[in-house]
């Protein structure tokens, strides 16, 4: 997966999809009460990016619904994964709980109500910290409560705090989440990968490859914009690379030394199926 980073308005969304990105990551802000409000990152953000792009969350959901619906004039077949990077820090536990319910309600309203089941996009609900686990809990409960339990097949989960892998697994076990888990490791592109290192990324890949007992479906690295970093990630066996330059990542993927092992994912590929590094 070539995952376009910080896709927070429609102009940049079109640009990245034109480049060939098959996944987008969007920052979602919340009110103090936990109501999803807008796609917005703000400053500081990645180097060489405009931090203040924004659009309302409802408009964002309507647009991505159109883009992922076959037969719609705006349909883009390469839009497979939508990573919702949830800006939850500072919210109370009650607000987090409400936020999980409201996100489920909004996804259902824009994508799946009224008998609509043909949208092709899959979501990853990306929570910053394991201490905010109640958000995932109430999201899953609300999906069942509103009759959308079957649509959990289109939803995955991720914690982005670069935390201890065993602690993260224990939280997933507590929540009863045993599949559809995307695991990530990374750092802003303003900091050289040399300073971050890849030991935790390698640990995630090892855990993914351990067998049926593992809890990880996919592993992605962020935010990789340099060729050396992208090549290293591919050699380690990641499933996705989040980047500010999707076309650049795809061009590396298509080089002979990598295309024999990798290809860009399509709709026929299950975003939650586990593939081992070879």
Curated annotation (Swiss-Prot):
Keywords: Cytolysis, Dermonecrotic toxin, Disulfide bond, Hemolysis, Lipid degradation, Lipid metabolism, Lyase, Magnesium, Metal-binding, Secreted, Toxin. It catalyses: an N-(acyl)-sphingosylphosphocholine = an N-(acyl)-sphingosyl-1,3-cyclic phosphate + choline; an N-(acyl)-sphingosylphosphoethanolamine = an N-(acyl)-sphingosyl-1,3-cyclic phosphate + ethanolamine; a 1-acyl-sn-glycero-3-phosphocholine = a 1-acyl-sn-glycero-2,3-cyclic phosphate + choline; a 1-acyl-sn-glycero-3-phosphoethanolamine = a 1-acyl-sn-glycero-2,3-cyclic phosphate + ethanolamine. One of its GO terms (cellular component) is extracellular region. It is an enzyme of class 4 (lyase). Gene3D superfamilies: Phosphatidylinositol (PI) phosphodiesterase. Its EC number is 4.6.1.-. Expressed by the venom gland. Its cofactor is Mg(2+). Mg(2+) binds at residues 25, 27, 85. This is Dermonecrotic toxin LspiSicTox-betaIE2i. It comes from the Eukaryota. Dermonecrotic toxins cleave the phosphodiester linkage between the phosphate and headgroup of certain phospholipids (sphingolipid and lysolipid substrates), forming an alcohol (often choline) and a cyclic phosphate. This toxin acts on sphingomyelin (SM). It may also act on ceramide phosphoethanolamine (CPE), lysophosphatidylcholine (LPC) and lysophosphatidylethanolamine (LPE), but not on lysophosphatidylserine (LPS), and lysophosphatidylglycerol (LPG). It acts by transphosphatidylation, releasing exclusively cyclic phosphate products as second products. One of its GO terms (biological process) is killing of cells of another organism. Its main location: secreted. GO terms for molecular function: lyase activity; metal ion binding; phosphoric diester hydrolase activity; toxin activity. It is found in: Secreted. Binds 1 Mg(2+) ion per subunit. The keyword Methyltransferase does not apply. The active site is at 5, 41 (nucleophile). Disulfide bonds join 45-51, 47-190.
């Amino acid at each position: 997966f070539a995952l376009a980073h910080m896709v927070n308005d429609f102009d940049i969304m079109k640009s990245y999809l034109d480049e060939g990105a098959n996944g987008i990551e969007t920052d979602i802000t919340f009110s103090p009460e936990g109501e999803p409000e807008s796609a917005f990152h703000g400053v500081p953000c990645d180097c060489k990016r405009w931090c203040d792009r924004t659009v309302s969350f409802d408009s964002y959901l309507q647009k991505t619904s159109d883009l992922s619906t076959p037969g719609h004039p705006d349909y883009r077949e390469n839009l497979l994964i939508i990573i919702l990077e949830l800006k939850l820090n500072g919210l109370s536990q009650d607000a987090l709980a409400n936020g999980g319910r409201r996100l489920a309600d909004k996804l259902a309203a824009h994508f799946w109500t009224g008998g609509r089941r043909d949208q092709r996009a899959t979501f990853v609900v990306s929570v910053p910290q394991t201490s905010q686990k109640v958000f995932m809990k109430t999201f899953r409960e609300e999906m069942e409560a509103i009759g959308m339990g079957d649509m959990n097949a289109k939803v995955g989960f991720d914690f982005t705090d670069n935390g201890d892998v065993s602690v993260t697994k224990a939280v997933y076990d507590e929540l009863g989440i045993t599949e559809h888990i995307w695991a990530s490791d990374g750092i802003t592109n303003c900091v050289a990968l040399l300073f971050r290192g890849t030991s935790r990324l390698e640990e995630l890949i090892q855990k993914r490859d351990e067998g049926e007992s593992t809890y990880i479906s996919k592993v992605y690295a962020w935010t990789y914009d340099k060729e050396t970093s992208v090549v290293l990630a591919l050699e380690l066996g990641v499933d996705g690379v989040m980047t500010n330059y999707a076309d650049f990542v795809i061009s590396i993927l298509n080089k002979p030394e990598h295309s024999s092992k990798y290809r860009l994912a399509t709709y026929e590929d299950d975003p939650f199926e586990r593939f081992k590094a070879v």
